[in-house]
Regions:
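Extended, charge-rich low-complexity regions and/or helical-solenoid scaffolds
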Residues: 445-770
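Long amphipathic alpha-helical scaffold regions
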Residues: 1-428, 433-436, 635-638, 644-665, ...
Length: 818
C-alpha cells in the first residue's frame, strides 16, 4: 500500500474518532452510560483495522488513548453516583467485537482494582487471560500495551495499598514478565513466514513497535519492591530465558539493550556473569559489539563512582574477566572469519569499552595483562581487516590508544602500543604523541622517567613528533607547539644520579640531532639548558660539600640546587673534574650539531656554558681550559659569520657583557679576550658602533685588569670614532656617554688616571656642537634629549665640586651651559 493510501486511511479513522469524541462527550454531559458505551464501541472499532503501518496505527492508538481517559473518569463518576462496579464490568462486555471489548474491559478493570484493592490479583490475571484472545500481532501488542499502561500504578508493590490485600509483589512480577513474554511472541510473529523485501519491510515495522515491548522492562525496573536479590533470583533469569528462547535477532538485540539500560547498574554488576553468559547463547546476527559497548560503558561510569561496585568486581573478578575474555575471543573470531563483512569500527569501539572497564574496575594484579590482551586483540583485528583503514577506523583506534593514558598503568609495559600507533594517520599520531607527553608533563602518569631504557621507549612512542613522515602536513605554529612540548620532557626526568642523567641526555641528543633543522632549533637549546642547569647543581653541591661555596650566594634556590642531585659518588677533585668535563663535552657536541643551522643560538649557548664553568670554585684552575674553549667557540662563530652591521654590534656587546662575569680566568686569557673584542670593535661598519664598543672595552680593562692606561687609550679611540661619526648630528650623544663613563671611572677608582684636560676637551666639544646646531637652526627633535642628558651630567659634576669630592672636579672648567 502506498504512503498516500496510508495517509488517507489514517485520516478517515481520525475523523471518525474525532466525531465519536464529540458524541461521547455529549453523552457524558447527559450522564447517559448506555449511549456512552455505544459511541465508545464505535470509536474503538477503528482500532480493528489491519491496513495501517505500525507507525500510523500508533498515531491512531494515541488519539484513542486520550479519549479513553475521559471515559475512565466518567466511569469513576458513575460509581460515585451509586452504580455497581460489577455491573459496569459486565456492561462493557456487550460489544460483539473483541478489540472494543478488551479496551473497555481493561478500563473498567483498572477502576475495579482502584475501588476494590483486594480484587487486584484476580482482576489482573483475568485481564491477562482475556487479552490472549487478540492474536493479530499489531492489535495484540497495542492491547497489551494499553493493559500495562492502565494498571501500572495499581500493581502490588512495596508500601502501596495493593500489596498484601490484593496480592503480593510476586504477582506483579509474574504479571509483567508473562505480559512481556506474550508481547515478545506477538512481536516476533510480525515477520514470520516472509522473505526478501517483504521481510525487510516487516522488520522495519517491528523496529517501530519495540518501545511497546520495552515498556514491560521499564515498568519492572521502576518497581520499588525490586531488590538486587529479587532481580538476581527471579527477574533477570526469566527475562534472559525469554530472550534466549525467542531465537530472534531483533528481539534479542533490543531486550538485551533494555536490560543494560533500564535496570540499576548495581543490579547488573551483581549479575554480570549471567548477562555475559547470555550473550554467548544469542543468535549469530545479534550485534554483540554494541551490547558490549553499552554494557561496559555504563558499568564503567558506575564503578568509577562506587567503591561498593569495585568491591563486587573484586570478589568476582576471575569469573567476570574470564567470561569477558572468552566473549571477546569469540567476537574477534567471528568477525575475522573469511567472508564476513567486519564492522571494524564497532569491534574496536567494543574493545575500547572493555579496556575502560578493565582500567576502572580491575584492582587485581592482572590489570596490565588484561589491557595488553585487548591491545593484542586490536592488533589481530587490524591484521585481519582486508580493506584500507579509513577515517572512522582511525578515530576508533585513536580512542582505544588514548584510554590507557588516563590510567596508572605504565605506558612502557603496553607492548603493542607503538605498533598500533603506526596504523594512525599523521595528525592522529601527532595528537596521541602529544597526549603521551602531557601525561608525563602534567603528572597524570605515575611512571618515573628515571632510566635510559624508559627514555628510549618513550621516544619510540612519540616518534611521529621527532622525525618527518611521508604524510606529514603541519603549519609552522602547530609544528613549533609540538616541538616545545617535546622539549618539556627534558625537564621532567626523575632521577638525581649524574651518571644516569648523562646517559639520558645523551639519548635525547642522539634522537634530537636527527630531527631536522626546524626541530633542532627548539629541542637542542632546551636540552643544552637542562645540561647546563644540571652542571650548576653538581658544582654548587660539590662546592658546598667542600666548603667552597660563597656564603653570600646562598639564596632561596641554594637548597633546591644541592638537594636535586646526588653527588655521593663524586668523592674527589679528580672525580668531580672527570664528571664535569664529560658533561661539557656533551654540551659541545650538541652545540656543534646546531651551529651550522643556528649560529646565533649556538653563540649564546657557548657563552652560557662558559659562564657555568666559570662559577666553579673547587679546583677551579683545572676548569679554565674548558671555560676558555667555550668562549673561543663563541668568538669563532662571531668571526666566521657575516651578519648585518647592527646585529654584529649587538653580538659583540653581548660577548663583552658576558666577559665581565668571568672572574676565574687568568690574566693572560682575559687580556687575549679583551684584545680580540677590541680588534673586532675596529672592524664594525658604523662609527657610532665602533665608539660604543670601544667604550665597553674600556670597561673591561677597568673592571677585569685595572689597566688604566688601556682604559684611557680606549676612551681616546672612542672620542676619535665619535668625531668621525658627527656627519650625523644625532651622534652627539656619544660624547656625553664618554663624559659619563669618565666620571664613572673617577668615582670608582682610588687612582686618578683620568686627566682633567681630557674631560675639558670632551666638554668643550659637546658645547661647541650644541651651539653650532642652534646657530644653524638645526634644532632637530633629538637635541633636547641630548641637552637634558648633558645637563644632568654637568649638574652632577657641580655637586661633586661643591662638596669637595675628588680634587679633579675642581680642575674641570667651562661647565656652564650656554
Amino acid at each position: 500500500m502506498s504512503e498516500d493510501d496510508q495517509d488517507r486511511i489514517l485520516d478517515q479513522s481520525l475523523k471518525v474518532i474525532q466525531a465519536q469524541s464529540y458524541h461521547i462527550h455529549t453523552t457524558i454531559e447527559k450522564n447517559n452510560l448506555r449511549q456512552c458505551l455505544k459511541e465508545t464501541f464505535t470509536m474503538l472499532n477503528e482500532l480493528r483495522t489491519n491496513k495501517l503501518t505500525p507507525k500510523n496505527y500508533y498515531h491512531l492508538y494515541t488519539s484513542v488513548f486520550d479519549e479513553m481517559q475521559h471515559i475512565s473518569n466518567f466511569f469513576k463518576e458513575e460509581i460515585k453516583r451509586g452504580r455497581r462496579i460489577r455491573d459496569l464490568y459486565d456492561s462493557v462486555q456487550q460489544s460483539m467485537y473483541i478489540i472494543p471489548r478488551m479496551y473497555l474491559l481493561i478500563t473498567s478493570g483498572s477502576i475495579y482494582i482502584e475501588n476494590y484493592p483486594k480484587s487486584c490479583r484476580e482482576v489482573i490475571f483475568d485481564l491477562l487471560a482475556v487479552v490472549k484472545g487478540v492474536q493479530n500481532p499489531i492489535r495484540g501488542l497495542f492491547t497489551r500495551y494499553y493493559l500495562l499502561k492502565s494498571i501500572k500504578d495499581k500493581l502490588p508493590d512495596k508500601n502501596n495499598i495493593y500489596d498484601n490485600e490484593g496480592g503480593n509483589f510476586d504477582d506483579t512480577l509474574k504479571f509483567i514478565i508473562q505480559n512481556l513474554d506474550e508481547m515478545n511472541r506477538l512481536w516476533i510473529r510480525l515477520s514470520m513466514g516472509v522473505i526478501g523485501e517483504e521481510k525487510k519491510l516487516r522488520e522495519k515495522d517491528r523496529n517501530e513497535l519495540k518501545i511497546l515491548i520495552g515498556e514491560n522492562i521499564t515498568r519492572l525496573a521502576s518497581l520499588e519492591g525490586l531488590s538486587n536479590e529479587i532481580y538476581q533470583r527471579e527477574v533477570l533469569p526469566k527475562i534472559l530465558n525469554i530472550i534466549i528462547e525467542s531465537k530472534d535477532q531483533l528481539s534479542q538485540q533490543y531486550l538485551m539493550e533494555c536490560i543494560i539500560h533500564a535496570f540499576p547498574d548495581e543490579f547488573n554488576i551483581s549479575c554480570l556473569d549471567s548477562i555475559l553468559n547470555c550473550t554467548k547463547k544469542l543468535v549469530s546476527s545479534v550485534d554483540i559489539k554494541n551490547l558490549f559497548i553499552g554494557l561496559l560503558e555504563k558499568l564503567s561510569k558506575f564503578v568509577k563512582n562506587s567503591d561498593a561496585a569495585k568491591e563486587q568486581i573484586l570478589n568476582n573478578s576471575n569469573t567476570i574477566f574470564s567470561i569477558l575474555k572468552e566473549s571477546f575471543d569469540n567476537l574477534i573470531k567471528e568477525n575475522c572469519k573469511e567472508g564476513n563483512n567486519m564492522d571494524i569500527v564497532k569491534v574496536i569501539e567494543s574493545q575500547c569499552s572493555f579496556m575502560k572497564f578493565i582500567i576502572i574496575s580491575c584492582v587485581s594484579d592482572n590489570k596490565l595483562e588484561l589491557v595488553n590482551y585487548v591491545l593484542n586483540l586490536s592488533d589481530e583485528v587490524i591484521k585481519s581487516y582486508g580493506e584500507k583503514i579509513d577515517t572512522s577506523v582511525i578515530k576508533a583506534l585513536n580512542r582505544l590508544l588514548s584510554t590507557p593514558l588516563e590510567s596508572e598503568l605504565s605506558l612502557f609495559d603496553l607492548n603493542q602500543f607503538p605498533k598500533l600507533m603506526n596504523n594512525l594517520d599523521f595528525n592522529s599520531k601527532n595528537n596521541l604523541s602529544l597526549r603521551i607527553i602531557e601525561s608525563f608533563v602534567n603528572g597524570k602518569s605515575n611512571e618515573k622517567l628515571d632510566s635510559v631504557d624508559k627514555i628510549k621507549k618513550l621516544l619510540n612512542f612519540i616518534k611521529p613528533l621527532l622525525e618527518d613522515l611521508p604524510d606529514s602536513t603541519q603549519d609552522d605554529f602547530q609544528f613549533e607547539y609540538d616541538q616545545y612540548n617535546v622539549a618539556k620532557l627534558i625537564f621532567v626526568i626523575n632521577t638525581n644520579n649524574p651518571e644516569i642523567l648523562y646517559n639520558i641526555y645523551t639519548e635525547f641528543k642522539n634522537v634530537f640531532i636527527n630531527g631536522g633543522a626546524k626541530r633542532k632549533k627548539i629541542t637542542l637549546p632546551s636540552l643544552i639548558n637542562a645540561i647546563i642547569n644540571l652542571c650548576y647543581s653538581i658544582s654548587i653541591a660539590y662546592d658546598e660539600k667542600n666548603n667552597n661555596y660563597p656564603q653570600e650566594k646562598k639564596n632561596e634556590f641554594f637548597n633546591d640546587r644541592i638537594n636535586s642531585i646526588d653527588i655521593s659518588k663524586i668523592n674527589s677533585n679528580d672525580n668531580f673534574y672527570d664528571t664535569m668535563i664529560k658533561f661539557y663535552k656533551l654540551i659541545n657536541d650538541i652545540i656543534q650539531s646546531l651551529n651550522q643551522e643556528q649560529p646565533i643560538i649556538s653563540f649564546k649557548l657557548y657563552l652560557q656554558a662558559a659562564l657555568q664553568v666559570n662559577s666553579i670554585n673547587s679546583n677551579k684552575e683545572k676548569f679554565e681550559e674548558a671555560c676558555v674553549s667555550f668562549i673561543n667557540s663563541a668568538f669563532g662563530i662571531y668571526a666566521d659569520n657575516k651578519y648585518e652591521g647592527d646585529y654584529k654590534y649587538s653580538l659583540l656587546n653581548l660577548l663583552s657583557g658576558y666577559l665581565l662575569y668571568f672572574n676565574n680566568l687568568s690574566k693572560e686569557n682575559i687580556e687575549n679576550f679583551i684584545k680580540n673584542i677590541q680588534s673586532s670593535a675596529h672592524s664594525l661598519v658604523k662609527r657610532s658602533d665602533q665608539c660604543n664598543s670601544m667604550i665597553f672595552v674600556s670597561q673591561l680593562y677597568f673592571s677585569l685588569l685595572k689597566d688604566y692606561k688601556s682604559v684611557i687609550e680606549c676612551l681616546e679611540k672612542a672620542k676619535k670614532f665619535a668625531d668621525l661619526s658627527m656627519t650625523n648630528p644625532q651622534n652627539l650623544n656619544l660624547f656625553v656617554i664618554i663624559l659619563n663613563k669618565m666620571i664613572y671611572y673617577i668615582e670608582n677608582s682610588d687612582e686618578m688616571f683620568i686627566q682633567s684636560k681630557f674631560i675639558n676637551d670632551i666638554n668643550e666639544v659637546i658645547q661647541s656642537h650644541i651651539e653650532t646646531l642652534h646657530n644653524e637652526n638645526k634644532f632637530i627633535g633629538f637635541l633636547p634629549e641630548i641637552e637634558n642628558y648633558y645637563t644632568r651630567t654637568v649638574d652632577m659634576i657641580k655637586i661633586r665640586r661643591e662638596i669637595g669630592k675628588k680634587g679633579i672636579y675642581s680642575e674641570i672648567t667651562n661647565i656652564d651651559i650656554k
